[in-house]
Amino acid sequence: MVDDVRHRARKRFGQNFLVDRQVIAAIISAIHPQPKDNLVEIGPGLGALTTPLLRLLNHLTVIEIDRDIVAQLQRDHSQDKLTIHSIDALKFDFSALGGDQRIVGNLPYNISTPLLFHLSRFCTYIRDMYFMLQKEVVERMVAEPSTSSYGRLSVMLQYRFAMEQIFTVPPESFRPVPKVESAIVVMRPLNKNAPVANDEALFSRIVTAAFSQRRKTLRNTLSAYLRGEDFNCLAIDANLRAENLTVRQYVSIADYCLSRSHK
């Protein structure tokens, strides 16, 4: 275990610090950083990943909201190799860091979902992302259609990224010890052949509406968008539920609704 736990974790920042050296080594190995990588770490905390990353990189950018941690990072590391942005990651403009970004981090559980949605806006600037998240969240991210874990988060993130759960991390690997298991997920932006909605805001509204009442059929949840004959045109069974549709089918629904509104 890493010995340095001087900083008291703050609940309002959702802080749980990774202290297991074996897990840290496994994460670094999975990331496989190269010296010239444009690598960004969100929430460096006590530097569990920061320190080994700096040994392998020419330069590292970190984003940290906790001013005490920022001060500690400034004391512990050379500013020639480390750029610190003291800001809430939810408000950070990742496009300012240029292209081909590799983003990593042990994300606070209390902001993980909104942060993933925020990052998805910058997917054209991103090569890949490696995150430690609550295991349940990762399972929802990578879930297949027609499973209980498949939901709005699955559809909206799979629309942008190919994702894979790499390995799980037990609660004992953190200080303080959380009540849940964690998992490492890798996210890579989809290539240009992936389906793209012509109106992404409409796509998002339709996905949200479909999953607003999971146990109801699409005939009910999408009644504001589709009538009986529309389901026939789309070759989609109106008696299915939201979790039964693929990302591509949601894109088809959004594009169909858009084309109909332009007639």
Segments (PLM) and residue ranges:
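Conserved active-site loop/cleft motifs that coordinate metal ions or position small ligands
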Residues: 221
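Nucleotide and nucleotide-moiety/phosphate-recognizing core
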Residues: 233
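Primarily a LysM-type cell-wall glycan-binding module
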Residues: 214
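Catalytic cores of RNA-modifying enzymes
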Residues: 1-209, 229, 243, 248-252, ...
